[in-house]
Amino acid sequence: MLSNAKLLLSLAMASTALGLVSNSSSSVIVVPSSDATIAGNDTATPAPEPSSAAPIFYNSTATATQYEVVSEFTTYCPEPTTFVTNGATFTVTAPTTLTITNCPCTIEKPTSETSVSSTHDVETNSNAANARAIPGALGLAGAVMMLL
């Protein structure tokens, strides 16, 4: 029973220290500001400053158009419209699927390919003082949690 209480206290303290905000669909963790102090046994180390150089990402989209000559094609019209294909005018008054056989017809198929790249390597901060971030941020409650 006591170990369950310790676990619940630890979870409550951890979520309080980091500012865990949650609802049924998502969670957000708010990290303490850079003014926070991380406390160890007998020392206090200022929290590391966030990196001022965020990685730069570039998105690239290449668009190409492919053409295909077909003997017939099927299209869906979800609402009333009028269009012309091979000199014939088609009028649609309600949602319907049409098969056009007045061909040969050239179908245009736009395609695109997206790529993402970064100009920076991802680095992690491995400061030994971070191991005690939660108890330090909680003060006395954190010290009590460490004793349990």
Curated annotation (Swiss-Prot):
Keywords: Cell wall, Glycoprotein, GPI-anchor, Lipoprotein, Membrane, Secreted, Signal
Molecular function GO terms recorded: structural constituent of cell wall
A single Gene Ontology CC term: cell periphery
Induction: Induced by transcription factors MSN2 and MSN4 in stationary phase and by transcription factors MSN2, MSN4 and HAA1 upon weak-acid stress. Up-regulated by low pH.
Compartments in which it is found: Secreted, Cell wall; Membrane
Gene Ontology process terms (BP): fungal-type cell wall organization; response to acidic pH
UniProt topology in membrane: Lipid-anchor; GPI-anchor
Lipidated residues (GPI-anchor amidated asparagine): N127
UniProt signal peptide: 1-19
Main location: secreted
Protein task: Cell wall protein that plays a role in adaptation and resistance to cell wall stress.
Protein name: Uncharacterized cell wall protein SPI1
Organism annotation: Saccharomyces cerevisiae (strain ATCC 204508 / S288c) (Baker's yeast)
